[in-house]
Amino acid sequence: MAPRKGKAPKEEQVISLGPQVADGENVFGVAHIFASFNDTFVHVTDLSGKETIARVTGGMKVKADRDESSPYAAMLAAQDVAVRCKEIGITALHVKLRATGGNRTKTPGPGAQSALRALARSGMKIGRIEDVTPIPSDCTRRKGGRRGRRL
């Protein structure tokens, strides 16, 4: 079918961090990696954290629910995010790694390490790596009851 007359295809507008950056200078963003045991989020923002540049989860990359938190899904998500960052002009990332935290587990899920590795392997420079898992100072009672979880 021929394209309609008078209807020009829309051109996708690409934001660039162009002229204000010198050659060879790194443009930083912040990669917030949230790795629970059910899913892995890779969310890149600007340095202030207000403007989202890309956000991809493990669940967006695989079909089976059980694979959402897998290292493979996290790797695919991180590769997608890296491609989007390069389009915009971000060349380096500070990484903020987070587990579920609070009164739940403080250990990052299986996708955390592979997401970080995939970002580095896809050409992004890594600045600082910081653990921002929420640590309770005093909180509500943990799940499991008085005698704890019986295995």
UniProtKB/Swiss-Prot annotation:
<keyword id="KW-0689">Ribosomal protein</keyword>
<dbReference type="InterPro" id="IPR018102">
    <property type="entry name" value="Ribosomal_uS11_CS"/>
</dbReference>
<protein>
    <recommendedName>
        <fullName>Small ribosomal subunit protein uS11</fullName>
    </recommendedName>
</protein>
<dbReference type="GO" id="GO:0006412">
    <property type="term" value="P:translation"/>
</dbReference>
<dbReference type="InterPro" id="IPR036967">
    <property type="entry name" value="Ribosomal_uS11_sf"/>
</dbReference>
<dbReference type="Pfam" id="PF00411">
    <property type="entry name" value="Ribosomal_S11"/>
</dbReference>
<dbReference type="GO" id="GO:1990904">
    <property type="term" value="C:ribonucleoprotein complex"/>
</dbReference>
<dbReference type="GO" id="GO:0005840">
    <property type="term" value="C:ribosome"/>
</dbReference>
<dbReference type="GO" id="GO:0003735">
    <property type="term" value="F:structural constituent of ribosome"/>
</dbReference>
<comment type="similarity">
    <text>Belongs to the universal ribosomal protein uS11 family.</text>
</comment>
<keyword id="KW-0687">Ribonucleoprotein</keyword>
<dbReference type="InterPro" id="IPR001971">
    <property type="entry name" value="Ribosomal_uS11"/>
</dbReference>
